Swiss-Prot record:
<feature type="binding site">
    <location>
        <position position="358"/>
    </location>
    <ligand>
        <name>Zn(2+) 3</name>
    </ligand>
</feature>
<dbReference type="GO" id="GO:0006508">
    <property type="term" value="P:proteolysis"/>
</dbReference>
<feature type="binding site">
    <location>
        <position position="327"/>
    </location>
    <ligand>
        <name>Zn(2+) 4</name>
    </ligand>
</feature>
<feature type="binding site">
    <location>
        <position position="48"/>
    </location>
    <ligand>
        <name>Zn(2+) 2</name>
    </ligand>
</feature>
<feature type="binding site">
    <location>
        <position position="36"/>
    </location>
    <ligand>
        <name>Zn(2+) 1</name>
    </ligand>
</feature>
<feature type="binding site">
    <location>
        <position position="231"/>
    </location>
    <ligand>
        <name>Zn(2+) 3</name>
    </ligand>
</feature>
<feature type="binding site">
    <location>
        <position position="358"/>
    </location>
    <ligand>
        <name>Zn(2+) 4</name>
    </ligand>
</feature>
<feature type="binding site">
    <location>
        <position position="25"/>
    </location>
    <ligand>
        <name>Zn(2+) 2</name>
    </ligand>
</feature>
<keyword id="KW-0479">Metal-binding</keyword>
<dbReference type="GO" id="GO:0070006">
    <property type="term" value="F:metalloaminopeptidase activity"/>
</dbReference>
<feature type="binding site">
    <location>
        <position position="203"/>
    </location>
    <ligand>
        <name>a protein</name>
    </ligand>
</feature>
<feature type="zinc finger region" description="C6H2-type">
    <location>
        <begin position="6"/>
        <end position="59"/>
    </location>
</feature>
<dbReference type="InterPro" id="IPR031615">
    <property type="entry name" value="Zfn-C6H2"/>
</dbReference>
<comment type="similarity">
    <text>Belongs to the peptidase M24A family. Methionine aminopeptidase type 1 subfamily.</text>
</comment>
<feature type="binding site">
    <location>
        <position position="40"/>
    </location>
    <ligand>
        <name>Zn(2+) 1</name>
    </ligand>
</feature>
<feature type="binding site">
    <location>
        <position position="14"/>
    </location>
    <ligand>
        <name>Zn(2+) 1</name>
    </ligand>
</feature>
<feature type="binding site">
    <location>
        <position position="301"/>
    </location>
    <ligand>
        <name>a protein</name>
    </ligand>
</feature>
Length: 385
């Protein structure tokens, strides 16, 4: 599950912090559109104004109804919301699933707002914890279990299966391993895993929409056991996908693995974004800026912050005992994102597809250990094997 990056200027090549928002976009209900200065805003105007035209055109198009699928009446949860792509939520959601009391729970599990007080206590710090031998063994165990749970989800992915059904299987797989599904009630996230289909970048909420032939879907798993979190995700093909989807998914996985190859003591965390963006751009794709990799151990999200785009300002140098995730989100079109009114589902602003892969890594004395590595198929992800 990705960490949220602070907003950066949307002007191509500018990575300054952005606090100014386009007033026309606000009026039209277009999310995002942040710039660092009037100069950058004016310099981007020629391309940026096309967003305004698209939003106006969408409002005058005759309405079609995406809310009926195979005789199943779906409730539109946000009437009037302008979707960027073809995907629609399929509501109502099922209630939040219970977790047996005998399973150890993270501090946010029963908080009314899902707030992690242990994370809040360290918010803003850039100090990166060096894990003890005991901590490292705990991380190895929980990451192995997280990998097993993702394997259960992988067997579920096929046309006609709903992401809600995948979530149910994930929930049961966590419970059977005496694990708490870390996303559940994390800042009130309502499900046990994230399922992100097509134009969804990350944090998609599982619902009753059946997967369709040609979809791509990312399943993001985090589990909590004995005080530690283990986090990973993969993007899967649903049935037969087009060549564009294959190129996107393959490139995204290559971005992750090329970054992992550079992980070793002495490397600056900011360097990973340079590696990822170089490979993505060489293949005609863009890199999401709003969501990042993160430190993980007894806390779900903590230092370091690990942006995936070039010329970022991430703080920190890798040392043995650091544990963190790399989880690049790569897009067919532009990197700009919006969020559905559910407050979680991040989607591409242009409605084009996005893919993601994630591993949890331990920095060793000479390189790194992939804690969430797949034990079968020589470690290859499911889309290859």
């Amino acid at each position: 599950m990705a960490a949220v990056e602070s907003r950066v200027c949307e002007t191509e090549g500018c990575s300054s912090e952005a606090k100014l928002q386009c007033p026309t976009c606000i009026k039209l209900g277009i999310q995002g559109s942040y710039f660092c200065s009037q100069e950058c805003f004016k310099g981007s105007w020629a391309s940026h104004k096309l967003l305004h035209k698209k939003a106006k055109d969408d409002k005058i198009k005759p309405e079609t109804s995406p809310w009926t699928m195979d005789g199943d009446i779906n409730t539109d949860p946000w009437p009037g919301y302008r979707y960027t792509g073809k995907l629609r939520p399929h509501y109502p959601l099922t209630p939040m699933r219970p977790v047996p009391s005998y399973i150890q729970r993270p501090d946010y599990a029963d908080h009314p707002l899902g707030m992690s007080e242990s994370e809040q206590a360290l918010k803003g710090t850039s100090q990166i914890k060096i894990l003890s031998t005991e901590d490292i063994e705990g991380m190895r165990v929980v990451c192995r279990l997280a990998r097993e749970v993702l394997g259960v989800a992988a067997m579920m992915v096929k046309s006609g299966i709903t992401t809600e059904e995948i979530d149910h299987a994930v929930h049961l797989a966590c419970i059977s391993r005496n694990c708490y599904p870390s996303p559940l009630n994390y800042y009130n996230f309502p499900k046990s895993c994230c399922t992100s289909v097509n134009e969804v970048i990350c944090h998609g909420i599982p619902d009753r929409r059946p997967l369709q032939d040609g979809d791509i879907v990312n399943v993001d798993i985090t589990v909590y056991r004995d005080g530690y979190h283990g986090d990973l995700n993969e993007t899967f093909y649903v049935g037969d996908v087009d060549e564009g989807a294959k190129r996107l998914v393959e490139t995204t996985y290559e971005c992750l693995m090329q970054a992992i190859d550079e992980v070793k003591p002495g490397v600056r965390y900011r360097e990973l974004g340079n590696i990822i963006q170089k490979h993505a751009q060489a293949n005609g794709f863009s890199v999401v800026r709003s969501y990042c990799g993160h430190g993980i151990h007894k806390l779900f999200h903590t230092a370091p912050n690990v942006p995936h785009y070039a010329k970022n300002k991430a703080v920190g140098v890798m040392k043995p005992g650091h544990v963190f995730t790399i989880e690049p989100m790569i897009c067919e079109g532009g990197w700009q994102d919006e969020t559905w009114p559910d407050g979680w589902t991040a989607i591409t602003r242009d409605g084009k597809r996005s893919a993601q892969f994630e591993h949890t890594l331990l920095v060793t004395e000479t390189g790194c250990e992939i804690l969430t590595r797949r034990l079968e198929e020589n470690g290859r992800p499911h889309f290859i094997s």
